[in-house]
Amino acid sequence: MRFSNLVTALTALLGAQAAAAVGDERDQLVKRASLTQVQNFGDNPSGIKMFLYVPDNLPENPAVVLVLHACAWTAEAFFGTTRYGQLADEHGIVLVFGQTPNDGDCWDVSSDQTLTHDGGGDSTGLANMVRYALDEYNGDPSRVFVTGESSGAMMTQVMAAVYPDLFAAASEFSGEPAGCFYTGTVRGWNSDCAGGQVQRTAEEWAATVRDMYPGYDGEYPRMQVFHGDVDTILHINSFNESVKEWSGIFGYDGTPLETLENNPGASLTKYIYGDRLQGIWGHGIGHVVPTNETEALTWFGIL
C-alpha cells in the first residue's frame, strides 16, 4: 500500500459519499453556498489553502471548527458532502476548511516540521488559519475544535498533539495516532504504521505526543476516535494504538468505563475511557467510517 492506493480508494469513496448525500438515512443534505477562500491568514510555510464558511446568524464569540479532508478530496468537496454547513447555520459556528497542495491531496503528517510546534509544516499553516478566524470573528478561544477523515483524521490527531493549547476537543474518523506516520519527510508513507505494526505502550505514545511541543504542561484536547473493524487501508490496530496514546496523555488505564452498543448508531459501539476520551468502533465498516457530524459536534459541546 502506498499513497497512490489510498488516493484511489478515497476517490471512489468521494463518489459514493456524494451519491449517498443526495438521500440516505441521515437528515436530508441541504445545499449551502460555496466556501470563501482567504488568501492572507498569516505564516503559511507549506502553502496550504484556507476556506471559510460563516453563517449569517453568527453570535458573539462563536465556536470555531477546523475541518480537514481526506486524500483525493478538496475542501469544497468535503464541505459539499457533509452537513457541517447546515449545522453551522443552525448553531452559529465558524467553519475553517484547510486544503493541502501536496501530491494526492494528502496532509503532511510525517515530517519533522509538521510534527513540531511552529515547526514550519502543514500544522503551522492550519494553526494560523484558526488564529485568523478567532481574530476576524471574535471567536471563543475556549471553543475551538478540529475534525477530519482519513488523512484529515491523522492530521486531526497531529493538531491535537502539536497545538494542544489551541483546541478544546478533537473528533477523527479513521486516522492514526499522532506521530505514528513519522518518516522525517513531507508526505512520507509509513508502511509499518499503516499496517498496524507500530505498537507502543501508553507511556511511550504519551512521550511521542509531548515531544511535539516541548515544555508544554497544560491540558490536551479531549479526543474521540472512530475506526472500522474491516479497514484494509489503515490497519484496525490504529484504533487500539490511538486509545493507548491518549490514555497515556490523560492518565487512563485504557480500560473502558462504559460500553454502549449501537451508539451513536447501528453497527457502532462506543467505548468511554473517561470524560476526555471516547473510542467508537464500526462493525463491518471499512475505510473510512463516514463522518458523523452530529456526534462530533455533540462531543465538542456545541449540540
Predicted regions located by residue number:
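Active-site nucleophile loop of the alpha/beta-hydrolase fold
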Residues: 100, 171-180
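A domain-start/cap signature at the N-terminus of enzymes
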Residues: 2-64, 76, 82, 90, ...
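Short beta-strand/loop motif that positions the catalytic acidic residue
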Residues: 225-227
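Short substrate-entry loop that stabilizes the transition state in hydrolases
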Residues: 58-105, 289
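Alpha/beta-hydrolase fold nucleophile elbow
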Residues: 138-150
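Cap/lid segment of the alpha/beta-hydrolase catalytic domain
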Residues: 99-121, 184
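Short glycine-enriched nucleophile-adjacent loop
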Residues: 153-165, 171
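Alpha/beta-hydrolase active-site loop
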Residues: 113-137, 158
